Regions:
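A short Gly-Trp-Pro
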Residues: 1-153
Length: 153
C-alpha cells in the first residue's frame, strides 16, 4: 500500500491552492475573538499540520499577510479567504481553515479553543425547527405564551 494522496484545498476565487499530506496532525474549533474577526463567523475549524507537510501549489504571490501579537494570518489578496494561521510559539506547525478542503483531512475536531471568548449570539446547539416555505433554513421557534385560565378565581 502506497502513501495516501495529499488533500487539496483552495480559496473561494481559486487563485490560491494548497495541499497537505494525509492525515492532518490535529483539528479543533477556535472561538477566539481574533479568529472570529478574521473569519467573520462565530468560530472557525482548523486543521494543524507540520510545516513540511503543507504546500502552496498555486498563487503564493497572491497571498497577503497580517501579523500581530505573535500570530501571522495569510489571506487570498483577491477574495479574502483565510489560508494560513501561524503562531510564533509553534514555528514548525501551520494551521489551515478546515473549510478550504472538500475531502477528508484525516482528523476530526477534538478541541474547543477560546470557548470563554465565544459571543453570546453564537449558536449553542439548541434544537431548531424548519422555517415554513424556506427548505434548509432552521429557526428558533418562539415559545407560546400560556393563556390565562378564565376559570381561575
Amino acid at each position: 500500500m502506497g502513501k495516501p494522496a495529499p488533500v487539496c484545498g483552495s480559496c473561494v476565487c481559486g487563485d490560491v491552492a494548497v495541499e497537505i499530506d494525509f492525515p492532518a496532525f490535529w483539528a479543533w474549533h477556535d472561538h477566539s475573538a481574533a479568529t472570529r474577526l478574521a473569519h467573520g463567523a462565530a468560530y472557525a475549524t482548523y486543521v494543524g499540520c507540520w510545516r513540511s507537510r503543507v504546500r502552496i501549489t498555486q498563487g503564493e504571490a497572491g497571498l497577503t499577510r497580517f501579523v500581530a501579537d505573535g500570530t501571522a494570518r495569510s489571506f487570498c489578496a483577491r477574495c479574502g479567504t483565510p489560508i494560513l494561521y501561524e503562531r510564533d510559539h509553534s514555528p514548525r506547525m501551520v494551521n489551515l481553515p478546515r473549510a478550504l478542503f472538500s475531502s477528508r483531512t484525516g482528523r476530526e475536531p477534538r478541541y474547543h479553543v477560546g470557548i470563554e471568548q465565544a459571543p453570546d449570539w453564537a449558536y449553542g446547539g439548541d434544537r431548531l425547527a424548519p422555517l415554513k416555505g424556506f427548505p434548509g433554513v432552521l429557526w428558533a421557534r418562539p415559545r407560546r405564551r400560556k393563556r390565562a385560565d378564565s376559570a381561575a378565581p
